[in-house]
């Protein structure tokens, strides 16, 4: 008597395609894309002046831990984890432009390596290494690998969380694998809450596997519950602050979705090329295509939908973490369409040449502060060259944010100028904004010379708060005015000081 039992269909496993790959090839799988992203990001790393947001990073990283924690209770909680990480980094390596941007560069390079590993698991070795290379060539990867903000770290965290989910699905009964996935996902949420929208793609993948093993829902649910326990209090705090931080982001219309790829890729040509390759993606299993397609499409659609409420969250940089998904699909498409390495390499070279103008553009001196370029460094050089002991300074805070921080960053640290109308610094009040002197006349201390820094080329006294301008006009005259890109640097001398007025 023969008893026949029907076996369940095999699980769609995502194991590395390394059976026929020599050890050197396994290393090159991730090391090649990592090195490429590192090299591209390192080129021109310090060429652009710090942006306003990067100046906030510098300011926050320079505060002690207690002050950072107190500040994020009031504002910018969504970046609190990043500020704490940067505080530790700056303590060790200083606050030069190179030092501030290196963590982002390392994260972007690491993300390229993880994308290659993901591609190997999902689509095979060729697709994996091509995906990593294509990812490294995307101009936005270099752009945000050169910015002292959290976005490159978020890309790495999302890619790593996805890789760890695949490992957990390989051995779903292994609790430590689920714990590793939960940890990576929690870090993702702590770095940027919107990036947790990638969970929609993860749930799609779990759903495919749960048809064969319903206990997967319990294991995945426990992992997500652990993430929620960590992130929800943080999310509630951030939600209470959005009115202060995102009031300026407009609600998106339908055209915003159409133009989003060009913004996310930092290259319309690059976006078009990778999307075209992504449409050619092929897989014998549906799960890889489902995962990557959901990862690429669902988060932007979700963010677009919720941005029609009280607050809009729709910015290209907020969904930058979808780039790995597009690179994975494009790597699969290229591997399927071009069977030989030589043919695939020709496509990669063509893409690099097509995106070269965008790569050059993002390394321009004022690109990080576009569309309002402000040459903080040139303004600081004017003051450094001509200052005298006892000089004071007035910054345009009327319609310009972080102009003061930018000039202070590029001034020599030993050069201290009294900020005439500053009552309390942001660090003193656990905020990002200063408190200014309520009665400007009372804040003038009789300095013979005051440097006035204003945005634009208008008459300097017209660019600052009217009450401050009135107080200065009554006692000072403009001795010299020097224009640098986006700014005017004026030297005021007390009316009883010697010297004739001149313009330069």
Which residues are covered by each model-predicted region?
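Membrane-proximal helix-loop-helix interfaces that form the catalytic/acceptor-binding platform
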Residues: 2-18, 25, 29-496
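Short, charged/polar, Gly/Pro-enriched secondary-structure boundary elements
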Residues: 497-504
């Amino acid at each position: 008597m023969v008893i026949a039992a029907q076996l369940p269909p095999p699980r769609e496993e995502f194991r590395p395609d390394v059976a026929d790959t020599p050890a050197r090839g396994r290393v090159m799988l991730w090391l090649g894309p990592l090195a490429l992203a590192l090299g591209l990001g390192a080129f021109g790393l310090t060429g652009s002046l710090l942006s306003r947001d990067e100046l906030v990073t510098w300011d926050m990283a320079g505060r002690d831990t207690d002050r950072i924690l107190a500040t994020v209770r009031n504002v910018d909680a969504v970046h609190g984890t990043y500020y704490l990480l940067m505080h530790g980094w700056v303590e060790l390596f200083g606050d030069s432009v190179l030092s501030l941007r290196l963590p982002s560069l390392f994260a972007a390079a690491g993300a390229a390596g993880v994308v290659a590993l993901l591609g190997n698991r999902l689509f095979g070795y060729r697709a994996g290494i091509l995906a990593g290379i294509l990812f490294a060539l995307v101009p936005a990867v270099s752009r945000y690998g050169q910015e002292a903000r959290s976005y490159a770290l978020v890309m790495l965290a999302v890619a790593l969380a996805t890789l760890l989910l695949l490992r957990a699905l390989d051995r779903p009964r292994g609790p430590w694998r689920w714990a590793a996935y939960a940890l990576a996902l929690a870090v993702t949420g702590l770095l940027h809450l919107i990036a947790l929208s990638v969970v929609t793609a993860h749930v799609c993948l779990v759903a495919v596997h749960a048809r064969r093993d319903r206990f997967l829902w319990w294991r995945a649910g426990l992992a997500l519950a652990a993430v929620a326990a960590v992130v929800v209090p943080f999310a509630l705090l951030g939600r209470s602050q959005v009115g202060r931080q995102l009031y300026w982001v407009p609600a998106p219309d339908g055209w915003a979705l159409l133009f989003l790829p060009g913004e996310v890729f930092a290259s319309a040509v690059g976006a078009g090329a990778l999307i075209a390759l992504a449409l050619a993606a092929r897989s014998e299993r549906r799960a890889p295509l489902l995962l990557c397609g959901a990862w690429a499409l669902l988060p932007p659609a979700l963010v677009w939908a919720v941005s029609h409420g009280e607050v809009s969250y729709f910015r290209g940089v907020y969904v930058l973490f979808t780039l790995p998904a597009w690179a994975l699909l494009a790597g699969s498409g290229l591997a399927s369409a071009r069977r030989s390495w030589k043919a695939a390499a020709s496509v990669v070279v063509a893409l690099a040449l097509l995106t070269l103008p965008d790569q050059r553009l993002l390394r321009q001196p004022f690109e990080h502060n576009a569309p309002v370029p402000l040459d903080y460094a040139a303004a600081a050089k004017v003051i450094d060259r001509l200052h005298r002991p006892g000089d004071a300074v007035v910054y345009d805070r009327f319609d310009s944010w972080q102009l003061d921080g930018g000039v202070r960053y590029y001034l020599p640290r030993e050069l201290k100028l009294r900020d005439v109308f500053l009552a309390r610094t942001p660090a003193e009040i656990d905020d990002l904004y200063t408190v200014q002197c309520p009665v400007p006349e009372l804040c003038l201390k009789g300095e013979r010379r005051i440097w006035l820094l204003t945005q634009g080329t208008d008459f300097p006294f017209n660019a600052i708060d009217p009450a401050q301008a009135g107080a200065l006009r009554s006692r000072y005259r403009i001795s010299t005015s020097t224009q640098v890109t986006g700014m005017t640097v004026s030297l005021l001398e007390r009316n009883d000081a010697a010297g004739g007025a001149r313009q330069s």
